[in-house]
């Protein structure tokens, strides 16, 4: 791998608090986002991702004040998502201190928004979040066996997740945040098949998310094609040096880390 693997803690925020659940359900309080952001910055995180997990499903804006306070505490790139619908929200997030914006539900509903945002700000600003799950029994199967979900994993779309990643890359997204809804919060490891399929379909960087439970889970995701690895529970509820442990595991597997 030509560039160093990035390790990214994820702050899933609901009503101004960091939360974590399993398969996006049963949310548990994990702390104050500003305090956690400061801790992860000091602990060696390469970037932070801040997702307002109910902004899209509740049809409300991201909590911009929390974004601003978080951005004031960290000196590493901050990606913010949740409730991003177009150029106006991205512009506001950047003014409040975000470095990149993540979009999911709005892009599925209107793919042209990807072109509009990247034309306005450049590809490097836009991350496409793909919440993918294996197609359910009784539902129409997709070609890859994975479908795109929206509204924080609550709604299936019937859209093939691999084809959607390919289309978004062709439209100009800078990165793909690939989250396995099936693995999310389970601590059983990343969905390696999903990562491999998307890696074969796109050339843009992939951030693998969903399922990390111990440092040993991270190297297989990198080997499958992830350029960065993202997790929440393992960092929120694990020892304070967990970022360092994860980087050590990746390095010992033969991959470069920052």
Swiss-Prot record:
GO terms for biological process: L-histidine biosynthetic process. It comes from the Bacteria. It is found in: Cytoplasm. It catalyses: 5-[(5-phospho-1-deoxy-D-ribulos-1-ylimino)methylamino]-1-(5-phospho-beta-D-ribosyl)imidazole-4-carboxamide + L-glutamine = D-erythro-1-(imidazol-4-yl)glycerol 3-phosphate + 5-amino-1-(5-phospho-beta-D-ribosyl)imidazole-4-carboxamide + L-glutamate + H(+). Keywords: Amino-acid biosynthesis, Cytoplasm, Histidine biosynthesis, Lyase. InterPro entries: Aldolase_TIM, His_biosynth, HisF, IGPS_HisA/HisF, RibuloseP-bd_barrel. CDD domains: HisF. The active site is at 12, 131. Pathway: Amino-acid biosynthesis; L-histidine biosynthesis; L-histidine from 5-phospho-alpha-D-ribose 1-diphosphate: step 5/9. GO terms for molecular function: imidazoleglycerol-phosphate synthase activity; lyase activity. Its EC number is 4.3.2.10. The keyword Ligase does not apply. Belongs to the HisA/HisF family. Heterodimer of HisH and HisF. NCBIfam families: hisF. IGPS catalyzes the conversion of PRFAR and glutamine to IGP, AICAR and glutamate. The HisF subunit catalyzes the cyclization activity that produces IGP and AICAR from PRFAR using the ammonia provided by the HisH subunit. This is Imidazole glycerol phosphate synthase subunit HisF.
């Amino acid at each position: 791998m030509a560039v160093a693997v990035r390790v990214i803690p994820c702050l899933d925020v609901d009503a101004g608090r960091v939360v974590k659940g399993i398969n996006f359900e049963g949310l548990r309080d994990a702390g104050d986002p500003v305090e956690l952001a400061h801790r992860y910055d000091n602990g060696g995180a390469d970037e932070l991702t801040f997702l307002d997990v109910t902004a899209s499903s509740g049809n409300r804006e991201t909590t911009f004040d929390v974004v601003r306070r978080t951005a004031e505490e960290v000196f590493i790139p901050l990606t913010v998502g949740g409730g991003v619908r177009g150029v106006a929200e991205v512009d506001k997030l950047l003014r409040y201190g975000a470095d990149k914006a993540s979009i999911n539900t709005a892009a599925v509903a209107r793919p042209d928004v990807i072109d509009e945002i990247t034309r306005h700000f450049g590809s490097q600003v836009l991350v496409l979040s793909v919440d993918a799950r294996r197609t359910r029994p009784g539902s129409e199967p997709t070609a890859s066996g994975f479908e795109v979900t929206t509204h924080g994993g609550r709604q299936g779309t019937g859209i093939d997740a691999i084809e959607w990643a390919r289309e978004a890359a062709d439209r100009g997204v800078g990165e793909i945040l690939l989250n396995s809804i099936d693995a999310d919060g389970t601590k059983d490891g990343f969905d390696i098949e999903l990562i491999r399929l998307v890696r074969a379909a796109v050339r843009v960087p992939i951030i693998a998310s969903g399922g990390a439970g111990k440092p040993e889970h991270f190297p297989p995701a990198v080997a499958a094609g992830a350029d960065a690895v993202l997790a929440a529970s393992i960092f929120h509820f694990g020892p304070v040096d967990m970022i360092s442990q994860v980087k050590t595991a990746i390095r010992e597997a033969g991959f470069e880390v920052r």
